[in-house]
Regions:
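Solvent-exposed, conformationally flexible loop/turn segments
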Residues: 129, 187, 245, 286-291
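Beta-strand-rich binding/interaction modules
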Residues: 162, 246-284, 293
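Exposed aromatic-hydrophobic patches
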Residues: 177-183, 290-298
Length: 337
């Protein structure tokens, strides 16, 4: 698939190639990493990027994502950060109006008749574009695994390429956008390119009372999915006022990489603030693409409820191992109350 600039004008297109949303849980290569809070499965791309600013789509460097970008002159910009705060474009505060009100008569596509969807943003005289490039080598801990890129926040619409290949498109500014880079990534000399447009059809929805910025304003990172991976995690604790007992209700979605592999194992442990495991359960992982494991257990002893006077926290640890007993991934969540 090729990128299409007209996606900016079409409210029916707000993501292309974007992975499904999931829980925001940290992943680690083993239990020791989880204890230290440093993961070998994650690589930050924050820092200095190559950058070119254009006032609209017509004047942007169209082939900037290619290694031989022609005559494009790149400057340096720091990521994360808004483009306006780096000296480009203008800072603009809006309360109740759209940022173009009083200048351009613009309404959402398809609301005023056929044909009015075309060109509202892609052909606008003023709709700034930021063209970002980042060169990187893949960290050792991510090699040989499925590699995902996570943009924590990009305002407002972005196109992504890796090594000259189109990867995807997304519009949601304030939630993470993830894409699978595995088919195109190399161990060394990767070229990541991101084209950010200030406005798209998402501007009709993201119309809150705040300053209007654009750019890669939150962190960007790569993370690896090992043989067994916690894809999604839902956990909810319950507290019984009558008897002081606590119950943990959890659903854990596990994905498996590769077909025909031997079964693995998942260990779940709920610990108190002293590290004592109060609840432990193990389950066999089958070699299917995805499986969701459910857990609902009541602790045998009374729990300490959280309060503003005693902010007591419990820790949920999930450890995945392969058929040889080697840890492939560890997840540690320390905010259960």
């Amino acid at each position: 698939m090729e990128a299409d600039i007209r996606w900016l004008d079409d409210p029916k297109v707000f993501r292309v190639g974007q992975l499904p949303a999931h829980s925001d849980h940290p992943i680690y290569g083993d239990v020791e990493e989880a204890a230290e809070g440093k993961s070998s499965l994650v690589q930050s791309l924050d820092g200095n990027w190559e950058f070119a600013y254009s006032v609209n789509a017509a004047s942007r460097p169209v082939d900037f994502y290619r290694d031989n970008a022609g005559d494009t002159e790149f400057e340096t910009i720091h990521v994360p950060g808004h483009i306006e705060l780096s000296g480009y474009d203008k800072i603009h505060y809006i309360n109740t109006m759209y940022p173009w009100e009083g200048k351009i008569y613009r309404r959402p596509a398809y609301t005023l008749g056929k044909g009015l969807a075309e060109g509202a943003f892609s052909e606008a005289e003023y709709n700034p574009v930021g063209s970002y490039r980042k060169r990187f080598h893949l960290a050792e801990g991510l090699r040989g695994k499925r590699v995902i890129i996570c943009f924590e926040g990009v305002e407002q619409a972005m196109y992504v390429w890796l090594n000259g290949h189109f990867v995807g498109y997304a519009e949601d500014s304030f939630t993470p956008s993830e894409f699978d880079l595995t088919p195109y990534i190399k161990e060394k000399d990767n070229l990541l390119a991101v084209e950010v447009h200030k406005r798209s059809t998402a501007a009709f929805l993201e119309d809150q009372d705040f300053f209007r910025f654009f750019g890669i304003f939150r962190s960007v990172e790569l993370y690896a999915k090992p043989q067994w991976h916690v894809e999604d995690l839902w956990a909810k604790p319950y507290f019984s006022v009558e008897d002081g007992k606590g119950t943990l209700d959890a659903a854990i979605k596990i994905s498996a990489e590769g077909e025909g592999q031997r079964p693995g194992k998942m260990r779940v442990c709920l610990s108190d603030a002293n590290g004592k495991c109060l609840l432990e359960q193990t389950q066999i992982l089958q070699s299917q693409a995805e499986q969701t494991l459910h857990l609902r257990e009541t602790l045998a002893e009374k729990v300490i409820p959280w309060s503003h006077e005693n902010s007591y926290l419990y820790q949920l640890d999930i450890t995945l191992t392969d058929s040889e007993g080697e840890v492939t991934e560890a997840v540690s969540y320390t905010h259960l109350t």
